[in-house]
Each structure stands twice: as structure tokens, then as C-alpha cells.
């Protein structure tokens, strides 16, 4: 086993599989994740009733977290405005820092009124029904009529 540690920030699919590859090369890996549970959108972005898909991913991720040279720390956001900064991670002198933080942003269409009350993004809604704080406590009030823009899996869910 190598002596110097690799720090991976983000435990979504990219971070998890990067961790597996790095750990299998013999490096100790410290895996830091903003959310309590690993998985990113694979955990919080899949409709809860799709249990087969979620369970399969959880099983794969569990095997990675069970590797003897992997240490997982959830609820550890990294960045300038958080308890752990990038500078502090660099001070630990890791052999490498890997950032696999995903793309949680919401795309805007540029339509008039899309910022009004009662307009919700799919991301916020999916996080809500997967109970990811702070989205789990959001009130998704609607009027008598609704419109869904898009045709991906979230629309079907």
C-alpha cells in the first residue's frame, strides 16, 4: 500500500468509481461528501419506487466503501464558505486532490416568469421526494393547472 493519501471530494457515481480505481492502485483514499449518504444523483435523483436500480447502485457503492483503504466522511461540504476549505485540504499534503462534485445546477430556459412563485425545477422536486435536506421540507404548492416542461425520466416520475 502506498503511504500518501488521495482525497476525493464528492461521492456521486464519478467520485465513487474514481475512489475504487485509486484504492485498487493501492492508495489510501479519504472520500468527502456534501451529503450524508454517498451516491449523489444516483441516490437522490432516482424516483424512490425504482428500487431495483437504487439497490444495485447502493450495492456497488457499498463495496467501494468497504475497501480497507477507503475512509468515507459524509456531511462534509468543501469550499470557501464551508468548514473545510480547499486550502486546508492542500495543507494535508495529499498525493492528489480529485474533485468529482457533479453538476447540480438548474438549467433555465430564459422564459418570462420562470422565476415566479410556483415554478419548480425538476432537481428540486426530485431531491424533495428523495428527502434530501433542505429540499425535503419545501412546500411544492400548485394551482389548479400545471405544466411540465421536458420529457425526461423526471417528467415520467
Regions of interest found by a model, annotated:
Residues 25-41:
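Glycine-rich FAD pyrophosphate-binding loop
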Residues 9-30, 81, 126-157:
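Rossmann-like dinucleotide/flavin-binding elements
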Residues 19-21, 43, 109-113:
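Short amphipathic alpha-helical segments
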Residues 1-9, 20-30, 47, 82-93:
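Rossmann-like nucleotide/phosphate-binding core characteristic of flavoprotein oxidoreductases
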Residues 44-73, 120-122, 129:
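N-terminal glycine-rich dinucleotide-binding loop that anchors FAD/FMN and/or NAD(P) in oxidoreductases
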Residues 24, 65-67, 114-116:
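Short, well-ordered coil/turn elements that cap or connect secondary structure elements
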Residues 2-4, 74-145:
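FAD-binding core/adjacent interface of flavoenzyme oxidoreductases
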Residues 31-34, 53, 68-69, 116-118, ...:
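Dinucleotide-binding/catalytic capping subdomain of oxidoreductase cores
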Amino acid at each position: 500500500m502506498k503511504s500518501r493519501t488521495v482525497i476525493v471530494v464528492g461521492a456521486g457515481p464519478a467520485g465513487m468509481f474514481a475512489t475504487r480505481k485509486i484504492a485498487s492502485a493501492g492508495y489510501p483514499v479519504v472520500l468527502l461528501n456534501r451529503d450524508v449518504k454517498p451516491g449523489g444523483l444516483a441516490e437522490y435523483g432516482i424516483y424512490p419506487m425504482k428500487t431495483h436500480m437504487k439497490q444495485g447502485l447502493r450495492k456497488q457503492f457499498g463495496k467501494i466503501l468497504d475497501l480497507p483503504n477507503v475512509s468515507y466522511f459524509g456531511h462534509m461540504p468543501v469550499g470557501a464558505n464551508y468548514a473545510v476549505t480547499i486550502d486546508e485540504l492542500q495543507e494535508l499534503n495529499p498525493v492528489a486532490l480529485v474533485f468529482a462534485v457533479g453538476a447540480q445546477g438548474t438549467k433555465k430556459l430564459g422564459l418570462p416568469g420562470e422565476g415566479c412563485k410556483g415554478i419548480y425545477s425538476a432537481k428540486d422536486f426530485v431531491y424533495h421526494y428523495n428527502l434530501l435536506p433542505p429540499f425535503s421540507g419545501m412546500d411544492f404548492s400548485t394551482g389548479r393547472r400545471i405544466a411540465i416542461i421536458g420529457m425526461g425520466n423526471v417528467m415520467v416520475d
